[in-house]
């Protein structure tokens, strides 16, 4: 019997909506990253993007454990000398709540062109409203 490998043109992708309200950041991000890769499907193939589309709502209500609210730092660098910037979780969740989940999930995906394609299937929104109702996303309990 031959080993099955998925073809990019035959992959069926579903849409799922995840409510992040009250969820722990890391536990939610690992499940989302796994589903973006397609590891929950029997036809998973490492070199083919077999994952689903994930819409995350209520990103502003995500939580972290311990003192990470004030201690967890996010860094960015402009590329110029002395160009490092840092912001803590508390300020970032107030400024751009979507970036918290996006950063966590992006770090869990492969760092190559396939990983970038997987990341594009993640849609994160701060509130409960999202513009993807036409895709009829199914609710995903995590």
UniProtKB/Swiss-Prot annotation:
SUPFAM superfamilies for the chain: Ribosomal protein L13 (SSF52161)
Biological process, per Gene Ontology: negative regulation of translation; translation
Purpose of the protein: This protein is one of the early assembly proteins of the 50S ribosomal subunit, although it is not seen to bind rRNA by itself. It is important during the early stages of 50S assembly.
InterPro entries: Ribosomal_uL13 (IPR005822), Ribosomal_uL13_bac-type (IPR005823), Ribosomal_uL13_CS (IPR023563), Ribosomal_uL13_sf (IPR036899)
Gene: rplM
A GO molecular-function annotation: structural constituent of ribosome
Keywords linked to the UniProt accession: Ribonucleoprotein, Ribosomal protein
Protein name: Large ribosomal subunit protein uL13
Pfam families associated with the record: Ribosomal_L13
Family to which the UniProt record says this protein belongs: Belongs to the universal ribosomal protein uL13 family.
GO cellular component, one term: cytosolic large ribosomal subunit
Quaternary assembly: Part of the 50S ribosomal subunit.
């Amino acid at each position: 019997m031959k080993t099955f490998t998925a073809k990019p043109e035959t992959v069926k992708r579903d849409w799922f909506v995840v409510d992040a309200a009250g969820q722990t950041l890391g536990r939610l991000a690992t499940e989302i990253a796994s589903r973006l890769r397609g590891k929950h499907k029997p036809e998973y193939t490492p070199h083919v993007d077999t994952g689903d589309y994930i819409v995350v709502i209520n990103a502003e209500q995500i939580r972290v454990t311990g003192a990470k609210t004030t201690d967890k730092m996010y860094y960015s660098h402009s590329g110029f000398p002395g160009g490092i910037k840092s912001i803590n979780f508390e300020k970032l969740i107030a400024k751009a709540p979507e970036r918290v989940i996006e950063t966590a999930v992006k770090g869990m995906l492969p760092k190559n062109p396939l990983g970038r394609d997987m990341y594009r299937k993640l849609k994160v929104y701060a509130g409960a409203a999202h513009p993807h109702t036409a895709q009829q996303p199914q609710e995903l309990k995590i």
